[in-house]
């Protein structure tokens, strides 16, 4: 797809026109019924002071520093939406809204406070603190980061997004349903009413054991991966929340047949 539209990583992470062009190519060339101009999980973390290696054509961006590994207070810049790594997404959404807003659904993407905490403190460090019972410490960090999620999501709606995917990686192989219920669910219930548009929660991996919790968090939809039993998900929470996804992107979508998909 990059070859077909003459746009590639890392340019598409850093330049709004390249970002919009690559998103549009997914619709015009591959036939996707949405355009989503964000390909990294590090747009916010770069704006918050993380050292990010933006990779190359064949590798994804990677965080190289954890500026709050000591769980020190996080002071969010007042102009965070104007930081280059976040501004580029807003500008790309505006470009797409002007050009194809009446033809195709435009999706935005933000990181939730749990994922942002991974980037600020380091994933292993953050989860270790939870395992050690330092719950006040991790909740404090997530609360300091929650305004970033809210502000970026609202700005994306204002820029032209029809819907925003909120990714928060409290996945089954990293945290228990109890941890989600006690630590993150209250924050999700608090932030969802503060965002002015439909939200899709994305959590990777096998989350069969927390579907009911997700359904009660205030999101319009849950985007789930192939490890979740789709029939089971529909039976248990399909009457409470819309369900999206369940296609294995690295195997079925990439190497499978149309019939497989």
PLM regions: where:
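Amphipathic repeat-derived elements
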Residues: 1-21, 66-79, 202-208
């Amino acid at each position: 797809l990059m070859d077909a539209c003459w746009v590639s990583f890392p340019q598409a992470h850093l330049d709004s026109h390249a970002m919009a062009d690559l998103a549009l190519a997914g619709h015009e060339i591959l036939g996707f019924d949405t355009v989503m101009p964000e390909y990294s999980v590090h747009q916010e973390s770069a704006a918050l002071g993380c050292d990010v290696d933006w990779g190359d054509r064949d590798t994804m961006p990677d965080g190289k520093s954890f500026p709050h590994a000591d769980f020190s207070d996080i002071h969010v810049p007042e102009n965070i939406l104007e930081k280059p790594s976040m501004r580029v997404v807003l500008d790309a959404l505006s470009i797409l809204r002007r050009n194809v807003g009446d033809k195709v659904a435009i999706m935005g993407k933000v990181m939730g406070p749990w994922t942002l905490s991974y980037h600020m403190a380091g994933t292993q460090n953050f989860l270790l603190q939870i395992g050690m019972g330092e719950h006040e410490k991790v909740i404090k960090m997530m609360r300091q980061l929650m305004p970033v999620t809210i502000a970026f999501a609202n700005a994306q709606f204002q820029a032209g997004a029809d819907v925003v995917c909120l990714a928060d990686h409290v996945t089954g192989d990293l945290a228990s349903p109890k941890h989600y219920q006690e630590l993150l669910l209250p924050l999700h219930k608090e932030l969802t009413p503060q965002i002015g548009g439909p939200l899709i929660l994305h959590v990777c991996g096998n989350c069969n054991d927390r579907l009911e919790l997700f359904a009660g968090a205030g999101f319009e939809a849950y985007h789930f991966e192939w490890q979740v039993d789709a029939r089971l998900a529909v039976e248990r929470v399909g009457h409470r929340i819309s369900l999206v996804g369940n296609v294995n992107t690295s195997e079925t979508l990439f190497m499978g047949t149309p019939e497989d998909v």
